[in-house]
Amino acid sequence: MDSEVSNGSGLGAEHITNLLVFGFLRNNDRDFHQELEVLGQELPVQVYLEGDREDELQTDGSRASRSFYHGRIEPDSESQDEVIHNIARHLAQAGDELDHSIQPTLVRQLAAQFMNGSLSEEDKRNCLAKALDEVKTSFPRDMENDKAMLIMTMLLAKKVASHAPSLLRDVFRTTVNFINQNLFSYVRDLVRNEMD
């Protein structure tokens, strides 16, 4: 994918959202670090795990890239993927400030719903939407609604994964699907604005 951001939901949207959610979760992942590493290896996108962030200095003074995407080496310029990782890091920092607004009871309820094997993906998205409705009152008044919704969606995913690390894969998939269905135009605009 070049520097142009995808317009619709599809492979481009999934790529962007996978990177965004993974990057958000990777910040402060102490409770589910191993599960996140496994997930990162399974994703069909370039993800940065700890240790991948530092490029080695070469003898000619340039930095060697460790960027791989589907087995191909990607260019060294600040790519869309790097922009998305930076956005994820920024959103995770904002999420740290909102962390207290999510009640442990809500996290336990959402985790229990995700553990219910009979729920469809749509049912899980609906459970996530209901949980978001419960925390809407705690959105900061000075923050755009879409930004607050995006942060809280990923923050709920992080809290459920922290509560029950075995749910990480399901929570990740549901979160990506929820964002692609409800918030992708906002995510796309965030990426476009950062790339300009």
Curated annotation (Swiss-Prot):
GO terms for biological process: apoptotic mitochondrial changes; establishment of protein localization to membrane; extrinsic apoptotic signaling pathway; glial cell apoptotic process; hepatocyte apoptotic process; mitochondrial ATP synthesis coupled electron transport; mitochondrial outer membrane permeabilization; negative regulation of intrinsic apoptotic signaling pathway in response to DNA damage. One of its GO terms (molecular function) is ubiquitin protein ligase binding. It comes from the Eukaryota. The keyword Oxidoreductase does not apply. A motif (BH3) lies at residues 87-101. Intact BH3 motif is required by BIK, BID, BAK, BAD and BAX for their pro-apoptotic activity and for their interaction with anti-apoptotic members of the Bcl-2 family. Induces caspases and apoptosis. Counters the protective effect of BCL2. This is BH3-interacting domain death agonist. It comes from Rattus norvegicus. The gene is Bid.
